[in-house]
């Protein structure tokens, strides 16, 4: 996923179907400089992680 699209998803009021390693996730924020995103699996906000944007897939 590119940086611009990830940022659009973060700012969108709608829930967008995005996965990381096949698991549905929520994007909290995007680090444009490092091309990473702070995410957590849906329903598991305690499992935050920083991942490369290239590993996120929009469905």
Curated annotation (Swiss-Prot):
Induction entry: Expressed only in the forespore compartment of sporulating cells.
Keyword Oxidoreductase set for record: no
Pfam families named among the record's database cross-references: SspH
Top-rank taxon, per record: Bacteria
GO biological process: asexual sporulation; sporulation resulting in formation of a cellular spore
GO CC terms: endospore-forming forespore
Cellular localization per UniProt: Spore core
UniProt key word Transmembrane helix: no
Record InterPro entries: SASP_SspH
Keyword annotations from UniProtKB, A to Z: Sporulation
Principal location: other
Family classification: Belongs to the SspH family.
Name by which UniProt lists this protein: Small, acid-soluble spore protein H
Organism: Bacillus licheniformis (strain ATCC 14580 / DSM 13 / JCM 2505 / CCUG 7422 / NBRC 12200 / NCIMB 9375 / NCTC 10341 / NRRL NRS-1264 / Gibson 46)
Taxonomic path: Bacteria, Bacillati, Bacillota, Bacilli, Bacillales
Gene name, Swiss-Prot/TrEMBL: sspH
């Amino acid at each position: 996923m590119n940086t611009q699209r990830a940022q659009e998803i973060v700012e969108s009021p709608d829930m967008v179907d995005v996965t990381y390693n096949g698991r549905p996730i929520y994007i909290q924020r995007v680090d444009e400089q490092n091309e990473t995103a702070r995410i957590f699996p849906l329903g598991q906000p305690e499992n935050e992680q920083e991942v490369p944007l290239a590993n996120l897939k929009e469905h």
